[in-house]
Amino acid sequence: MSARYEIIRDFSGNCHFELRSGASLPLLTGGNRTTLALCRGSIASARIICDAPLEDIRGYTGAATGVLKFPKYRFERMPSGRYTFSLWAKNGKRLAVGPACGTVSAALDALAAARREARYAPVSERIGGV
């Protein structure tokens, strides 16, 4: 089974998207959008910029990159000690976040999977999900 985008709409009409792997693991999760059109637009943006470079200011991945221009992925260590990445759009706003991973290598594996699958994954919709 291949990766897919899921648009999840709540009963109030807000929605967000998730890019899920073939094993149904989250690869990217977008923020709340007020309309379905905005959510679809966010998926279109993620498809376009999925090959963006990785910014790692603190050198968690082995080599610090310094600050990069948008669009980009930003590698981060969460206050909980777990690692994640976020996808930033050309306008400088965060578009989506990756899963919280226990190790740097797990986060880099999730990033590689997101880059590989984001461009061509099909889209499905769910109503009433969380």
Predicted regions and their residues:
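Intrinsic disorder/low-complexity detector
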Residues: 1-7, 11, 43, 47-81, ...
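A structural feature that tracks compact, well-ordered secondary-structure segments
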Residues: 8, 14-22, 27-33, 42-45, ...
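Short, tandemly repeated low-complexity microdomains enriched for cysteine and small residues
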Residues: 27-35, 55-61, 95-103, 123-129
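Residue-level recognition of oxygen-bearing side chains
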Residues: 38, 106
